[in-house]
């Protein structure tokens, strides 16, 4: 590098950095190219894509890799900022489809649906459920700030936060995997921190102190089980290991 600079060879083409506006416009192409309709759920395809062609598939996932609802909110917000009617229209199709067809009988998100195989995963995860709530509370807060309300979505999120409280264990943890009837499939509490932020957001939005108390319990669990022991080991692929990525939320 020094050799090139000393001879005036540094960046011959005098490249200029792209502006934030330009980059957002380019990246927003994902919201259009990945948009999938024709199923009971409308979504942006973003899970298990083939790198050779990035062709959309029939897998719709709330949270984790798919982040269907968070993608919809990001597109919605950017659509308003940039006056993109196409993005706003697509985002609302996602929200409307999940409001109508995206919840289980109890009220959890249908977090992982594969329309290619006609399969809906009957086992829920605290991480995907939490990240779905997180996304929708961002949407509701944004809408409220701009003078718009969505009573049906507010009721759905209130119900979800209430049923999360039923899942919380005495030590403050949340089971990693569970079914719609609250049967616990995986008792490990490694993904507990993923629930902390949506609980705090729920408290801020709904002014319900129970959610803040629950969030504090998750923080206490995190401190006692993870931080004080300083035993971060293995990887997030290990179900018996704490989810470090999720803990960053807390």
Can you name each region flagged by the protein language model?
Residues 69-85, 131-149, 194-209, 249-250:
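Well-ordered alpha-helical scaffold segments within catalytic/enzyme domains
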Residues 2-9, 13:
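Single conserved hydrophobic/aromatic residue that forms the stacking wall/gate
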Residues 86, 120, 148-152, 183, ...:
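A structural signal for alpha-helical segments
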Residues 192-229, 240-250:
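Active-site neighborhood of glycoside hydrolase catalytic domains
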Residues 51-68, 115-133, 176-194, 231-249:
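Solvent-exposed loop and edge beta-strand segments that line ligand/cofactor-binding
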Residues 15-58, 86-109, 153-175, 209-232:
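Long, well-ordered core segments of solenoidal/helical folds
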Residues 77-80, 103, 141-145, 169-173, ...:
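Short, flexible helix-adjacent loops and helix caps
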């Amino acid at each position: 590098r020094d050799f090139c600079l000393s001879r005036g060879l540094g960046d011959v083409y005098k490249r200029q950095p792209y502006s934030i506006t330009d980059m957002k416009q380019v990246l927003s192409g994902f919201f259009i190219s990945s948009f999938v309709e024709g199923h009971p759920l409308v979504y942006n395809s973003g899970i298990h894509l083939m790198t050779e062609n990035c062709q959309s598939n029939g897998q719709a996932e709330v949270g984790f890799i798919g982040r269907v609802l968070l993608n919809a909110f990001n597109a919605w917000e950017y659509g308003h900022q940039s006056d993109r009617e196409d993005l706003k229209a697509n985002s609302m199709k996602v929200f409307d489809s999940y409001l109508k067809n995206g919840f289980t009988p109890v009220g959890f998100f249908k977090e992982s649906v594969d329309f290619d195989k006609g399969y809906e995963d009957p086992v829920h995860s605290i991480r995907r459920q939490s990240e779905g709530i997180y996304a929708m509370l961002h949407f509701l807060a944004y809408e409220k700030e701009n003078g718009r309300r969505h009573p049906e979505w507010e009721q759905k999120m209130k119900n979800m936060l209430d049923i999360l409280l039923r899942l919380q264990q005495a030590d403050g943890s949340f089971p990693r995997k569970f079914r719609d009837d609250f049967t616990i499939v995986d008792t490990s509490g490694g993904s507990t921190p993923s629930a902390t932020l949506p609980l705090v957001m729920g408290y801020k939005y709904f002014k319900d102190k129970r959610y803040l108390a629950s969030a504090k319990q998750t923080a206490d669990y995190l401190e006692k089980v993870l931080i004080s022991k300083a035993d971060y080991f293995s990887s997030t692929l290990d179900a018996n290991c704490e989810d470090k990525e999720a803990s960053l939320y807390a």
